[in-house]
Amino acid sequence: MSASVLSVISRFLEEYLSATPQRLKLLDAYLLYILLTGALQFGYCLLVGTFPFNSFLSGFISCVGSFILAVCLRIQINPQNKADFQGISPERAFADFLFASTILHLVVMNFVG
């Protein structure tokens, strides 16, 4: 059983490293960073507490929102999804991501107080 799981993981990594464009790998690294940051904040909340609750909520909402926006960007710039997003260039998708991210962080900063 564990040998088959290891073979599936190794094949996944081989195909990911050989077939995934560099832009998507960079975006995946950003997604991993956001995921780990959100998990760290949630773990801190469980261990220490949520004394400044607005600060915790702001940070966690920022992580979740940024993750969602980055996933949307990844879907739009993936070459395999080109047929679904014919009218949107990768540059336009990135500009939309920057605009939405700016709005998200303005709302988060307003929520902090």
Curated annotation (Swiss-Prot):
Keywords of the record: Acetylation, Apoptosis, Endoplasmic reticulum, Membrane, Transmembrane, Transmembrane helix
Pathway(s) this gene product operates in, as recorded in its UniProt entry: Protein modification; protein glycosylation
Side of membrane Cytoplasmic, spans: 2-30, 74-92
Subcellular compartments: Endoplasmic reticulum membrane
Membrane topology, Lumenal segments: 52
Keyword Cell membrane: no
Domain of life (superkingdom): Eukaryota
GO BP term, pick one: apoptotic process
Membrane topology according to the record: Multi-pass membrane protein
Transmembrane segments annotated in the record for this chain: 31-51, 53-73, 93-113
InterPro entries: DAD/Ost2
Example of a GO MF term: enzyme activator activity
Residues carrying N-acetylserine: 2
A GO term from the CC aspect: oligosaccharyltransferase complex A
Function (record text): Subunit of the oligosaccharyl transferase (OST) complex that catalyzes the initial transfer of a defined glycan (Glc(3)Man(9)GlcNAc(2) in eukaryotes) from the lipid carrier dolichol-pyrophosphate to an asparagine residue within an Asn-X-Ser/Thr consensus motif in nascent polypeptide chains, the first step in protein N-glycosylation. N-glycosylation occurs cotranslationally and the complex associates with the Sec61 complex at the channel-forming translocon complex that mediates protein translocation across the endoplasmic reticulum (ER). All subunits are required for a maximal enzyme activity.
Record text on subunit structure and interactions: Component of the oligosaccharyltransferase (OST) complex. OST exists in two different complex forms which contain common core subunits RPN1, RPN2, OST48, OST4, DAD1 and TMEM258, either STT3A or STT3B as catalytic subunits, and form-specific accessory subunits. STT3A complex assembly occurs through the formation of 3 subcomplexes. Subcomplex 1 contains RPN1 and TMEM258, subcomplex 2 contains the STT3A-specific subunits STT3A, DC2/OSTC, and KCP2 as well as the core subunit OST4, and subcomplex 3 contains RPN2, DAD1, and OST48.
Entry similarity comment: Belongs to the DAD/OST2 family.
Record protein name field: Dolichyl-diphosphooligosaccharide--protein glycosyltransferase subunit DAD1
Source species: Bos taurus (Bovine)
Gene: DAD1
